[in-house]
Curated annotation (Swiss-Prot):
Tissue specificity note: Mostly present in leaves and flowers, with increasing expression in older flowers.
Protein name: Leucine-rich repeat receptor-like serine/threonine/tyrosine-protein kinase SOBIR1
Modification after translation, per record: Autophosphorylated on Ser, Thr and Tyr residues.
Effect upon mutating residue 407 to K: In evr-2; loss of kinase activity
Protein task: Dual specificity kinase acting on both serine/threonine- and tyrosine-containing substrates. Acting as a counterplayer of BIR1, promotes the activation of plant defense and cell death. Component of the RLP23-SOBIR1-BAK1 complex that mediates NLP-triggered immunity. Functions as an inhibitor/regulator of abscission, probably by regulating membrane trafficking during abscission.
Assigned keywords, A-Z: ATP-binding, Cell membrane, Glycoprotein, Kinase, Leucine-rich repeat, Membrane, Nucleotide-binding, Plant defense, Receptor, Repeat, Serine/threonine-protein kinase, Signal, Transferase, Transmembrane, Transmembrane helix, Tyrosine-protein kinase
Stretch list, region Disordered: 243-278
Length: 641
């Protein structure tokens, strides 16, 4: 049956364009989903998931895009081989999946892997030595499984590890593999079969906020420094990629079996026969065209609907475009001055002046400010796995983000000569950028380290000035600001010094504003840093202003003694801690033994002993007996040179 040429051309042109558009769109989507994924990662992932037992839980439909699967997260990386960008597997999160397999040695092929979370399964056998090839690994969470055997001896080569949880398994051997993991923040090896002594090096891990060695009956001796800590980690939250929404493809099925009859008494066709045949052909062509166009239109509509549906879900789950920057200082004239924080290449070119649990601190020149230098602190805020988000979770996260912005807004408007001013805040889905004034002298911890190494001098008048400045800043936060702000992590690393050696307390208000950020607190909402935490916190888990006073007392002791709580010196004393050693020396026949030898015989011994007594007063075990920040500032101000 022929279709009239004119009509066919009229209808087929838009049809051909629609088909071509659909095919181009399909090929584009396919290239995004497949062509940019690193082939070696794909092969490794296939083996890893098979041996873990993940594949048995997955339908064939989920194999379309490995980076869109539940638990598999990828990031763009530049390939040195091809010179192009590829997707690399950076996180594998298979918690609570009832897995009963093993970790494949192929895990070592994932050279960009930053997180491996397999908690709460029934996985068995040993942790393969091949995991040592994952040099980028930062999070290893294997708790609540049935792993056995010993941890590989060269485990310390995973120097980037921040979170290590091996608890509730059947692992054995000694703990020497922990010796050089100096970037650890959260550590738990509880409820295993480990034996031997706990490595003394752990006390020098400055980033360590939390550790748990309990439940290992064969371990010998106490835990270093803070042997009473018995905390439990909570699941480490990770970044996510929203799962693909299935595309629907409705089709239309027109009824083309209709017939017509001539009215009774109507004339016979005669000369109208050819016209009727042409009319019939047009109707058939229209029916066929309608069927094809309807089918293709339905398919395209279904595809578009699925994309829109996905975008709506992302918006509901808090993945909407982040708000613009909050600016708190006239130094930053417009939001565009902070646009470089959205540029990965621009950030990569900045000088890194510090690294910690929260991420990195960059030194940058503020655009349009005639050379004004700023410090940009990146605070990691990993979002929850999209597959685990419920509607209630989404509402909670949205409320939480509003609360974070509100808290930071409060901090941004605080101004005091002994508090480091926050200039701006830029929020991103997975991190926060906090912009501060740049302090060229660095932190008190940096200076004390240089002094101890003999590279710098810090005489007593300068130390007293620093102590008085910290006390004044605390007094403002505790007594003068409404609402009261408790620092929660006061330590030398959070005290910066300006050009006049005036103390500036940093990071105040952040521990409350961002409790899930991996900054100065653990994921179980435990605040502070080992060596500076008030003893009552381990019983009450409540942080008060008297906890800040305790931390300040430790800093006063450091300024006089010249040693940090993590110094090996205290490990060779009977007291095993700075505070206990300080108390015993100050009540001994010769309290001057507590004074830093670099400060002796300069005529300030009496003043330093007075400050040491104030330090003991601030670190009393009973928080009710400790002074408040105003009393401390008053006592220090009465000590004259």
């Amino acid at each position: 049956m022929a279709v009239p040429t004119g009509s066919a051309n009229l209808f087929l042109r838009p049809l051909i364009l629609a088909v071509l558009s659909f095919l181009l769109l399909s090929s584009f989507v396919s290239s995004v989903e497949w062509l940019d994924i690193d082939s070696s990662d794909l092969k490794a992932l296939q083996v890893i998931e098979t041996e873990l037992g993940v594949n048995s839980q997955r339908s064939s439909a989920s194999d379309v895009n490995p980076c869109g699967r539940r638990g598999v997260f990828c990031e763009r990386r530049h390939s040195a081989t091809t010179g192009e960008y590829v997707l690399r597997v950076t996180r594998l999160v298979y918690r609570s999946r009832s897995l009963t397999g093993t970790i494949s040695p192929v895990i070592g092929m994932l050279s960009e892997l930053k997180e491996l979370t397999l908690s709460n399964n029934q996985l068995v056998n040993a942790v393969p030595v091949d995991i040592l090839s994952c040099k980028q690994l930062e999070v290893l969470d294997l708790r609540k499984n049935r792993f056995s055997g010993q941890i590989p001896g060269n485990f310390s080569s995973l120097s980037r590890l921040r979170i290590l949880d091996l608890s509730s398994n059947k692992l054995s051997g000694n703990l020497n593999f922990l010796k050089n993991l100096r970037n650890l923040e959260n550590l738990s090896v509880a409820n295993n079969l480990f034996s031997g002594k706990i490595p003394e090096q752990i006390v020098s891990f400055h980033n360590l906020r939390f550790f748990d060695f309990s439940g290992n009956r064969y371990l010998e001796g106490p835990a270093p420094v803070m042997s009473s800590i018995k905390l439990q980690t909570s699941p480490h939250q990770t970044r996510h990629i929203l799962a693909e929404t299935p595309t629907s493809s409705p089709t239309n099925k027109p009824n083309n079996s209709t017939t017509s009859k001539a009215p009774k008494g109507a004339p016979k066709p005669g000369k109208l026969k050819k016209k009727k045949k042409k009319s019939k052909k047009k109707k058939v062509a229209a029916w066929i065209l309608g069927f094809v166009v309807g089918a293709i239109g339905g398919t395209i509509s279904g595809f578009v609907f699925s994309v829109l549906f996905k975008l709506i879900i992302q918006a509901i789950r808090g993945s909407e475009k982040p708000p613009g920057p909050s600016i708190f200082s006239p130094l930053i004239k417009k939001a565009e001055d902070l646009a470089f924080l959205e540029n990965e290449e621009a950030l990569a070119s900045l000088e890194i002046i510090g690294r910690g649990g929260c991420g990195e601190v960059f030194k940058a020149e503020l655009p349009g400010s005639n050379g004004k230098i700023i410090a940009v602190k990146k605070v990691i805020q990993p979002p929850k796995d999209a597959d685990e988000l419920t509607d209630e979770d989404s509402k909670f996260l949205n409320k939480k983000m509003r609360q974070i912005r509100s808290e930071i807004n409060t901090v941004g408007h605080i101004r005091h000569r002994n508090l480091l001013p926050l200039l701006a805040h830029v929020s991103r889905p997975e991190c926060h950028y906090l912009v501060y004034e740049y302090m060229e002298k660095g932190s008190l911890q940096d200076i004390l380290t240089d002094v101890q190494a003999g590279n710098q001098e810090l005489m007593w008048p300068a130390r007293h000035k620093i102590a008085l400045g910290i006390a004044a800043g605390l007094e403002y936060l505790h007594m003068d600001h409404n609402p009261r702000i408790i620092h929660r992590d006061l330590k030398p690393a959070n005290v910066l010094l300006d050009d006049d050696m005036e103390a500036r307390i940093s990071d105040f208000g952040l521990a409350k504003a961002m409790p899930d950020a991996v900054t100065h607190i653990t994921t179980s909402h435990v605040a502070g840093t080992v060596g500076y935490i008030a003893p009552e916190f381990y019983q009450t888990h409540k942080f008060t202003d008297k906890c800040d006073i305790y931390s300040f007392g430790v800093i006063l002791g450091i300024l006089v003694i010249g040693k940090l709580p993590s110094d090996e010196f205290f490990q060779h004393t009977d007291e095993m801690s700075l505070i206990k050693w300080m108390r015993n020396i100050i009540t001994s026949e010769n309290p001057s033994l507590a004074i830093d030898p670099k400060l002796m015989d300069q005529g300030f011994d009496e003043q330093m002993l007075l400050v040491l007594k104030i330090a003991c007063y601030c670190t009393l075990d009973d928080p009710k007996q400790r002074p408040n920040s105003k009393d401390v500032r008053t006592m220090l101000s009465q000590i004259k040179h």
